[in-house]
Amino acid sequence: MGSDAPTDVITDTSTLVNFLRIGRVDLLAGLTSYRFVVTDHVRYEVTSYYPTQLSSFEFALLAGHVVEITLDTPADLTVFAELKALRLGDGECAYIAGALNRGLPLAIDDTRARKEAVARNPSLRLLDTVGLMVEAIQAGLLTVAEADVIKVDWETNHRFIKKHFLSFAELIR
């Protein structure tokens, strides 16, 4: 692959669902330096816990905005089991195993899961919903004002709590 090839990013359910819920997977697709990769655990979690997002998820897969993989190698299963013993959820275990075993960045918001991932590989690159929104603003995919409206919607309707900043303007450099 050439230097312009996008970087695969293992993406957890919560990060993806944040964009699915507002109908803005186009923001992820517009971040052309990344290719968002989800595990089959994401499909299970979207189907089981976010059924209203299932059609948007399936469209994102068909459109190539996200790519699905199955974690079934011995290395994946070993890391999964080790993390499961720490009482992480199946999804978190899968995302972390996928990122660690493939040397890929991980887009995940869960604080405890992020700590476990970095404990296993301190150089693991972590992304999150807020950082992806900042990159989308910097790429001209939306304005700060539009991002702030989305932030309020997430905080009000979607268990997204990022009170450490009032506006994305504070995060733009």
Residue ranges and their predicted role:
Residues 2-98, 102-104, 111-116, 120, ...:
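Active-site-proximal, substrate-binding regions of enzyme catalytic domains
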Residues 125-142:
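Long, charge-dense
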